[in-house]
Curated annotation (Swiss-Prot):
Domain notes: Has 3 domains, the large (RuvB-L) and small ATPase (RuvB-S) domains and the C-terminal head (RuvB-H) domain. The head domain binds DNA, while the ATPase domains jointly bind ATP, ADP or are empty depending on the state of the subunit in the translocation cycle. During a single DNA translocation step the structure of each domain remains the same, but their relative positions change.
Chain intervals for the UniProt region annotation (Small ATPAse domain (RuvB-S)): 185-255
Source organism of the structure: Bacteroides fragilis (strain ATCC 25285 / DSM 2151 / CCUG 4856 / JCM 11019 / LMG 10263 / NCTC 9343 / Onslow / VPI 2553 / EN-2)
Subcellular location per the Swiss-Prot or TrEMBL entry: Cytoplasm
Pfam assignment, any one: AAA_lid_4
Biological process, per Gene Ontology: DNA recombination; DNA repair
UniProt-recorded Gene Ontology molecular function terms: ATP binding; ATP hydrolysis activity; four-way junction DNA binding; four-way junction helicase activity
Protein name: Holliday junction branch migration complex subunit RuvB
Cross-referenced NCBIfam families: PRK00080.1, ruvB
Keywords on record: ATP-binding, Cytoplasm, DNA damage, DNA recombination, DNA repair, DNA-binding, Hydrolase, Nucleotide-binding
Binding site for ATP: 23-24, 65, 68-70, 131-133, 174, 184, 221
Catalytic activity: ATP + H2O = ADP + phosphate + H(+)
EC nos: 3.6.4.-
GO cellular component: cytoplasm; Holliday junction resolvase complex
């Protein structure tokens, strides 16, 4: 029986997070890929250490699963300071933010994931914390209300977002270091898979690692998740070692095609072709037709489909490309003929 694998599996459960943490590099030396980003961070971190001061605030942005959390942890490790993690949706009110900020030791790193989802009132409190290392808190209500100023230890805020366009200009301006993470090439992903296989103590040939890498959508998190699934097939259907044959068998069973597209990716393309004659069509309409969340399609699936040339954005909406027709075995001519006959 086939088991579908889709990208939403990587909104990590606690067990999956433990697995990912076991594979997470802890230093710049061990981090594969993102060479320009890592090289710049090495310089910034070393300079901050030489001056014995907090590193400038860092904004990391790019698609999910490319290493934003990992790099944040590495920054703290390389600085030799504490590392605290939270996320935009968790910081619901100013008191939540104040509790986190006042717990920081000098020069600690505070990582806020999904920083674009901070509420406006919490974001405003963050401004003075980032600029002046202080916050103003209101005590009591009504006529007896008063503001007290709380001084904070110097700290580095590392904000991560998959949707940098949603950040307000005032918040973006307060990050002294702004870095974009790109998708990884297959050679780098193959190295990551081989390293992870070694940590998991599962033999994996370089050819098999390359095969898994080629279907990992340029994303280390997906590469490690696929390795975990292929390991299951190797233990149950094979000898326990991962070779090209068992890798291909597992990936086919998981409905991951040679481009790394899963069932949802192909449904998106098929829906645009079959129901909307290839487009253009609006994102909300696509989401409604699929019964999916528009934000998930835009954030998780669409970037890779556009990068690989299966989909394009136009002022009038999304359109599939000729490559998508070829990939799905559909006729572009028939679709256009139907369009003009309507």
């Amino acid at each position: 029986m086939e088991e579908d694998f889709n990208i939403r599996d990587h909104q990590l459960t606690s067990r999956e997070r433990d697995f990912e943490n076991a594979l997470r590099p802890l230093s710049f030396e061990d981090f594969n890929g993102q060479d320009k980003v890592v090289d710049n961070l090495r310089i910034f971190v070393k300079a901050a250490r030489l001056r014995a001061e907090a590193l400038d605030h860092v904004l990391l942005h790019g698609p999910p699963g490319l290493g934003k959390t990992t790099l944040s942890n590495i920054i703290a490790n390389e600085l030799g300071v504490g590392f605290k993690v939270t996320s935009g949706p968790v910081l619901d009110k100013p008191g939540d933010l104040a509790g986190v900020l006042t717990s920081l030791e000098p020069n600690d790193v505070l990582f806020i994931d999904e920083i674009h989802r901070l509420s406006p009132v919490v974001e405003e409190y963050l401004y003075s914390a980032m600029e002046d290392y202080r916050i103003d808190i209101m005590i009591d209500k009504g006529p007896s209300a008063r503001s007290i100023q709380i001084d904070l230890n110097p700290f580095t805020l590392v904000g991560a977002t998959t949707r940098s366009g949603l950040l307000t200009a005032p918040l973006r301006a307060r990050f002294g270091i702004n870095l974009h993470l790109e998708y990884y090439d297959d050679d780098i992903l193959s190295n990551i898979i081989s390293r992870s296989a070694g940590i998991l103590d599962v033999p994996c040939s370089s050819q098999a690692a390359g095969e898994i890498a080629s279907r990992s959508r340029g994303t280390p998190r997906i590469a490690n998740a696929l390795l975990r699934r292929v390991r299951d097939f190797a233990q149950v259907k094979g000898s326990g070692s991962i070779d090209t044959e068992i890798a291909n068998y597992a990936l086919e069973a998981l409905n991951i095609d040679k481009y790394g597209l899963d069932e949802i990716d192909n449904k998106i393309l098929c829906t645009i072709i079959d129901k909307f004659k290839g487009g253009p069509v609006g994102l909300t309409t696509i989401a409604t037709a699929l019964g999916e969340d528009a934000g998930t399609i835009e954030e998780v699936y669409e970037p890779f489909l556009i990068k690989e040339g299966f989909l394009k954005r136009t002022p009038r909406g999304r359109e599939v490309t000729e490559l998508a027709y070829k990939h799905l075995g559909r006729s572009l001519y028939n679709s256009q003929k139907t369009l003009f006959n309507d």
